[in-house]
Amino acid sequence: MANLRIALVAGEASGDILGAGLMRALKAQHPAVEFIGVGGPLMQAEGLTSYFPMERLSVMGLVEVLGRLRELLKRRKDLIATLIAEKPDVFIGIDAPDFNLNIELKLRQAGIKTVHYVSPSVWAWRQKRVLKIREGCDLMLTLLPFEARFYEEKGVPVRFVGHTLADTIPLEADRAAARAELGLPDGPLVALMPGSRGGEVSRLGALFLDTAQRLRAMRPGVRFVIPCANPERRAQLEELLAGRDLPVTLLDGKSHLALAACNAVLIASGTATLEALLYKRPMVVAYRLAPLTFWILKRMVKSPYVSLPNLLAQRLLVPELLQDDATVEALAQTLSPLIDGGEEQTRGFDEIHRTLRLDASNQAADAVLNLIGQTR
């Protein structure tokens, strides 16, 4: 079996998790393999030689990106030159499309096979990016089936590999065990998940807590749990909770335990909705943006739904209350019946979970090795 040299670049923690799983699967199928590129501690533990710390790529927000733009462009230019000199058998860009798609284009022009793992949201907006993907990418690996259908229509070689979260989250979560671990009592429990970013919690935190108070008036026995993404979000939520008489348990992280423990979820639109779906917890999705941002996005977004559960179901499976529709009364009235109901949602969630549960890392490894003619 010939020695393989595989280059990978991940730009953030979620990519590091995916990359490490893919590397494990590649080694299992083709033990004589060397990994080079950029990754975090998990990928390095699997044997990646990282040219520089992954954190140098982990920037969020326009201001932060502009502040680091010169460094990012130089790192990308140097990385392209290094990889062309190293001539890997294949390059795998993991997410981070603004950084990786340009690398893929340059490497493919230099005769190196390229794979992009995790589709950017081209199906929803900025659809012209698909032209760059088609030019720079030998193979797109998608986590979600509707993404693969989009690429097929656009003539991009694609393979739907499933979602690693669907592989790791059990088909039936143990609510009683989760409550015991968190020290939460029996009775109706609602998880409030207003987002992981400061701006999201600023826009949605008070709205979600006001909704909790309204729910409490409608159903006096209901309690609440809020998983906090980090210490900053916890401090923000503690400030919003001051002066409110609400039975709320704040958790540090532990979003998966909160979802397993609860009966229903009030949740910001985002990737956490997929986790709630996989835990089969009925949900109401809410989101508010700055009015101008919402106006612009409404004209740019091509999709009829904003939440992943509805995009995956290809129908309105979960209620979406956006912008001015996201009022306390509307959220409370929509959420209340789901606390001890929501069977239609959970049936749909179970179907979707089974569709996504494909052993993603092995599927991705198969696709990569097949592309470079190294299948077993």
UniProtKB/Swiss-Prot annotation:
Its EC number is 2.4.1.182. Keywords: Glycosyltransferase, Lipid A biosynthesis, Lipid biosynthesis, Lipid metabolism, Transferase. GO terms for molecular function: lipid-A-disaccharide synthase activity; phospholipid binding. GO terms for cellular component: membrane. Coiled coil: none annotated. It catalyses: a lipid X + a UDP-2-N,3-O-bis[(3R)-3-hydroxyacyl]-alpha-D-glucosamine = a lipid A disaccharide + UDP + H(+). One of its GO terms (biological process) is lipid A biosynthetic process. This is Lipid-A-disaccharide synthase. The gene is lpxB.
